[in-house]
Amino acid sequence: MAKLTVKDLDLKGKKVLVRVDFNVPLKNGVITNDNRISAALPTIKYIIEHGGRAILFSHLGRVKEEADKEGKSLAPVAKNLAEKLGQEVIFPGSTRGAELEAAIDALEDGQVLLVENTRFEDIDGKKESKNDPELGKYWASLGEGIFVNDAFGTAHRTHASNVGISANVEKAVAGFLLENEIAYIKEAVEAPERPFVAILGGSKVSDKIGVIENLLEKADKVLIGGGMTYTFYKAQGIEIGNSLCEEDKLDVAKSLLEKSNGKLILPVDSKEANAFADYTEVKVTEGEAVDAGFLGLDIGPKSIAKFDEALTGAKTVVWNGPMGVFENPDFQEGTIGVMDAIVKQPGVKSIIGGGDSAAAAINLGRADKFSWISTGGGASMELLEGKELPGLAALTEK
């Protein structure tokens, strides 16, 4: 990566501004999954072990009006982080003002301070999300010209807490997580060890058009599963019953199939049910066609075998999007089957592009078998599409 990283800096005695991604799920004030906090630890520890004073910024959820602040404070995150670091995390509970500034000025080498949810600044005119120049300048003024971006999850956004701060400091550099994310995903797509197989699931073709187009050029095979299967089926005149279908994307699906030169591989059967939730019948289709009154909710056993065969010998695999409604035990076999087919390949570099696929790997007990699980769904999608990420573009060149 031709950008400066945290290792290129002298941190001793410096107030170091750090954008992390602590956008964790909370239920009644309790963090239900703290993976993102753990993922930021190497960078935070490196800064404090080298005598820096870490000032952390993160958003949490969406905040549009005063009422949205309820349950969106980073206070539980400060507590969790303090436990992980084994030291106090100072939390003034504000995004600006005299109290925050005094707490930052009082920091000693090796201490950590967490600024309150950056999206609290969105209540008055979306200052964070619209990259308000004054806000970026103000936050940059809290440090000493050094900014570390370690939030891959927001690298595709142009916000005050990443791009805004970057524009107002002498050196904006990548943290370890951001560096690893870019290395794994970009290298997999730009310079993969072959055969390179991409697997795309999820419900909508519209979300993945750019990704499919880019990967059809780069990958040796592109396997399609999940709800978007049925838009591809209908585009070929295959009966899909009541399955999910984006009628306005049938032409796009048809054109992708035509220009894929056989690289695009679709399921050959489905697991179908007579309703999405309160179903009374679940069965496997004979072939591709879904029965009238039924909807496809997972790929079937023949498809799992077909995808297993397509993955044989793969050296690089990028997977984004589950094969079915994996949250329901009746429709998780496809996702499990594909995960197992990926991780059993000898010497494979296997990458999960965040979002639902990451949740599936974690919930179904396969996470530790993958080479890399991305922390950013939207950001990894844009990298897979071949786009430049604003948060990355704003960093200082080496």
UniProtKB/Swiss-Prot annotation:
Gene3D superfamilies in alphabetical order: Phosphoglycerate kinase, N-terminal domain
EC number: 2.7.2.3
Catalytic activity annotation: (2R)-3-phosphoglycerate + ATP = (2R)-3-phospho-glyceroyl phosphate + ADP
Keywords: ATP-binding, Cytoplasm, Glycolysis, Kinase, Nucleotide-binding, Transferase
BP terms from Gene Ontology: gluconeogenesis; glycolytic process
Pfam families according to UniProt: PGK
Record-listed substrate binding positions: D21, F22, N23, R36, H59, L60, G61, R62, R119, R157
Annotated PROSITE patterns: PGLYCERATE_KINASE (PS00111)
Entry's localization field: Cytoplasm
Class of this enzyme: transferase
Positions of ATP binding: K208, G296, E327, G354, G355, D356, S357
GO molecular function, one term: ADP binding
Annotated GO CC locations: cytosol
Keyword Lipoprotein: no
Keyword Cytoplasm tagged: yes
Pathway: Carbohydrate degradation; glycolysis; pyruvate from D-glyceraldehyde 3-phosphate: step 2/5
Family membership: Belongs to the phosphoglycerate kinase family.
Subunit annotation: Monomer.
Protein name: Phosphoglycerate kinase
